[in-house]
A protein has these predicted regions:
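Conserved C-terminal "switch" segment of AAA+ ATPases
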Residues: 4-26, 38-43, 93-100, 113-119
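C-terminal helical "lid" of AAA+/P-loop NTPase domains
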Residues: 5-19, 27-33, 51-55, 66-71, ...
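Conserved C-terminal helix/linker of AAA+ ATPases
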Residues: 16-39, 80-85, 142-147, 160
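Active-site flanking loop/helix segments enriched in acidic
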Residues: 35-41, 45-57
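Terminal-proximal interaction/regulatory segments of ATP-powered molecular machines
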Residues: 59-179, 186-218
């Protein structure tokens, strides 16, 4: 029932609002008197907030990102926030700022360890950096390009020279710069490109590396 969900949400907010995790009647009364912070996890509003949160970060709107973070924090959604942030950093920031991945994971670990209210500072700080970071979804696009190829074409045979214990395999570390001309894709997919770099500083460097490697294998 809605009453049961409300009680559960209230208890969850109380739990994350006290550092020693000791919930008293006074704490429950205090949190319960805070207006308009709860949302029904089974209703549209909960998922609308999570959607708005991610889209604000993706859209590089730092003010909106902080606002929706505050809404979710006040609703006791620490776990949901941390899960969503770890998706966002790889889905929407990705290779445009690859150092953000470990930063976000570390921030989420720290937020969970210290709990509320101190987690607010940790998450607020990392959200600002995420929102203002350059963005790229090339990693997401690349893996789904590969998945769609598998779904649409089935499984082609692995080239014999890279099968296990095949003497025809050329061990790259035995060659200059650990690079040797050798085909790795099935012959039916030769020349396929799943990863298409976006225009940003880091991926421009990756593009040059990739193009140089492709020249070697021509």
């Amino acid at each position: 029932s809605s009453d049961l969900r409300f009680a559960y949400n209230l208890l969850e907010v109380c739990y994350y609002s006290v550092s020693d995790k000791k919930i008293t009647l006074d704490i429950v009364k205090s949190i319960n008197n805070t207006p308009n912070i709860f949302h029904d996890k089974d209703g549209d509003n909960y998922y609308d907030l999570l959607s708005a949160f991610q889209k604000s970060i993706r859209g590089s709107d730092v003010q909106a990102s902080l606002y929706y973070l505050a809404r979710l924090l006040e609703g006791g959604e620490l776990e949901a926030i941390c899960r969503r942030l770890q998706v966002i950093v790889y889905e929407d920031i990705g290779l445009a700022n690859s150092s953000m991945g470990p930063k976000v994971v570390s921030a989420c670990i720290a937020a969970r360890e210290v709990g509320m209210p101190e987690a607010t500072i940790i998450l607020g700080t990392i959200i600002i950096e995420m929102a203002l970071s350059p963005k790229s979804n090339s990693g997401e696009s690349a893996i789904y390009n590969a998945i769609n190829t598998v779904k649409n074409n089935g499984s082609y045979p692995v080239p014999s020279h890279i099968k296990k214990n095949n003497p025809a395999y050329k061990y790259p570390h035995n060659y200059k710069n650990s690079i040797v001309k050798q085909e790795y894709l099935p012959k039916e997919l030769k020349g396929s490109k799943f990863y298409i770099p976006r225009e940003n500083t880091f991926e421009n460097k990756l593009k040059i590396i990739m193009e140089n490697l492709e020249k070697i294998n021509k």
